[in-house]
């Protein structure tokens, strides 16, 4: 089936060429970083996780979001998701590849990543994170390819694949739960020291992943004969809406706990993220615009996905709502959550983080690599659908 990815119109090749250009530029930037060291990034002693790890955190959620198609289809026999389940599995593959790439570029010596396997430490969350991420990637590769191959041959999927499909569901939950535990297990960081980090991560994941799938389904409908179906899209939007509202509720709970308890350490990070902190005549507020964007775009997205006209009768506004939801959650978890957790540091000092141009280009390149992989996988899936259904 791989040969199907080698056939496409000029726009398909222009798109891949566009992504490939940024991938090449990012590769050059990474070689510079590899030779010079992480001193080329904006990270420091006080901010040891920067743009790379914040993107990793967000993309783990995007990967986990695909389970919101797998679970209803395979467990609850919701047949409307039959045509788009493969989109969720392929999105998980591309997202997990990006996750692993962000971990690699965050390491000064990438070869040291093998130490996690060569010298396993089960008491460390990093060990379990490596285990579930690679396990979930393997499961999606196996299930997605076997099921698509069966569909291509117009035969039922082999029965032996279904246990792997069912196993992938708890794996999807675990990848973001373990990632959350990496943060909430650090007692020196009050912003992350919360029992609802894992539920909050899952809520945002179940909004972000399906949002991107809806956008992809709408685009595929316009550029090919692939149609996910109105019922499937509407049900996904319902899932997105409930998940986004749950995530917003959890954010409000964080504010209530911090400000009602009036514990300075709990308030500090939220003050920095949403209002800025002034200390010794200097105002630190470089993340405030991003968090304002998170709130404003999130409210607009929820409104667009709630109003019947924009949700069911106008695909442009439906797609716009999903795009805004995806960006809003990226601003929250892909920017604010990780970077805001380092302010203030355990010594009550403030060190702001500014990514370098080299760091930004590597980040863009990894995202482009993910979309490159996703484009090829979706191309194969769509061609299989077109060959079968015409």
Spans of features found by a protein language model:
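Alpha-helical transmembrane segments of multi-pass membrane proteins
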Residues: 18-38, 101-107, 173-183, 374
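Membrane helical hairpin/interfacial module
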Residues: 47-111, 128, 132
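Hydrophobic alpha-helical transmembrane segments
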Residues: 60-68, 291-304, 369-370
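Short, membrane-exposed interhelical loops at transmembrane-helix boundaries
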Residues: 116-118, 268-280, 341-359
